[in-house]
């Protein structure tokens, strides 16, 4: 055993992701407006002794959708059941989940936009009427059977709200958009994570990690662990700004959080397509990445920074994108032509 405060015992290392998750709304950092509203809805449901209305969390990945769903179940004092859209292949799979719920339980479906349309049809009466309509048998002998369900709360999570069918989206009484975090909020996330992991960190170190975390708590937690590795091997007693800067530079994460893949994306538009427009399928092929990765992982933060624009003709590099690459737009392109308002 070592006295180095950066070292953790085996029990501390085990399941660090779960250990770092906040357990209550009071512990949850950021999303102040959404959090305050959820507190009201939870208290109202508890006072009425009813199941809370169905909730839809939407926004970029890594902002706390799953964590908030777990917190809702915990604060309601009910069971938490979790699954994901692609896993529920058949209507029977969903029926098995729903019929095993107890009064007030929370059923969490991640990537709910990827539900099979046939499964969605079964979900509609379950959400609205607390009932399950099933067809038993085939052909002339087939008959419809309605099974009553206990009151429950469905919580859906999606990074692609626009892909949800309107009838499904409209059945969620509590839609909640999650926003990217500010640097100050991420500093608190990093400081809290370091404390829970038994890592010493000063304000400069927390700020450096926060600035490069893409506005996303999940990224902040991942970078914190990697910086801890560098600090530990260097024999440092705590993470400072210089240690964090050195570690993140070696990990090829730049000053505003862009990684190698982000820079490849920007460089491809700038060098090969002269700033765009260029189609997303072309970019996906050039980067050897699926379209979903481009649209859900790479682009949201670049759009948030004002570096690219999604237009009807394709992706275009904005002035800030050119500036970040240290390049000037082609002479034929007017400054600001593809600005954020396009």
Swiss-Prot record:
Chain positions covered by the region annotation Small ATPAse domain (RuvB-S): 182-252
Identify the residues that bind DNA.
291, 310, 315
Region span, Head domain (RuvB-H): 255-342
Cleavable signal peptide: none
**Which residues are listed for Mg(2+) binding in this entry?**
66
Q: Which domain of life is it from?
A: Bacteria
A molecular function GO annotation: ATP binding
Q: What is one cellular component GO term in this UniProt entry?
A: cytoplasm
| Region feature (Large ATPase domain (RuvB-L)) | 2-181
Binding sites annotated in the UniProt record for ATP: 20-21, 62, 65-67, 171, 181, 218
Q: What is its main location?
A: cytoplasm
Q: What Pfam families does the record tag this protein with? A: AAA_lid_4, RuvB_C, RuvB_N
Record-listed E.C. numbers: 3.6.4.-
Annotated keywords: ATP-binding, Cytoplasm, DNA damage, DNA recombination, DNA repair, DNA-binding, Hydrolase, Nucleotide-binding
CDD domains linked to this entry:
AAA (cd00009)
Q: Mind telling me which InterPro entries this protein's record contains?
A: AAA+_ATPase, AAA_lid_4, DNA_helicase_Holl-junc_RuvB, P-loop_NTPase, RuvB-like_N, RuvB_C, WH-like_DNA-bd_sf, WH_DNA-bd_sf
Assembly description: Homohexamer. Forms an RuvA(8)-RuvB(12)-Holliday junction (HJ) complex. HJ DNA is sandwiched between 2 RuvA tetramers; dsDNA enters through RuvA and exits via RuvB. An RuvB hexamer assembles on each DNA strand where it exits the tetramer. Each RuvB hexamer is contacted by two RuvA subunits (via domain III) on 2 adjacent RuvB subunits; this complex drives branch migration. In the full resolvosome a probable DNA-RuvA(4)-RuvB(12)-RuvC(2) complex forms which resolves the HJ.
Give the function comment from the record. Answer: The RuvA-RuvB-RuvC complex processes Holliday junction (HJ) DNA during genetic recombination and DNA repair, while the RuvA-RuvB complex plays an important role in the rescue of blocked DNA replication forks via replication fork reversal (RFR). RuvA specifically binds to HJ cruciform DNA, conferring on it an open structure. The RuvB hexamer acts as an ATP-dependent pump, pulling dsDNA into and through the RuvAB complex. RuvB forms 2 homohexamers on either side of HJ DNA bound by 1 or 2 RuvA tetramers; 4 subunits per hexamer contact DNA at a time.
UniProt note: domains? Has 3 domains, the large (RuvB-L) and small ATPase (RuvB-S) domains and the C-terminal head (RuvB-H) domain. The head domain binds DNA, while the ATPase domains jointly bind ATP, ADP or are empty depending on the state of the subunit in the translocation cycle. During a single DNA translocation step the structure of each domain remains the same, but their relative positions change.
Family recorded in the similarity comment: Belongs to the RuvB family.
Q: What is this protein called?
A: Holliday junction branch migration complex subunit RuvB
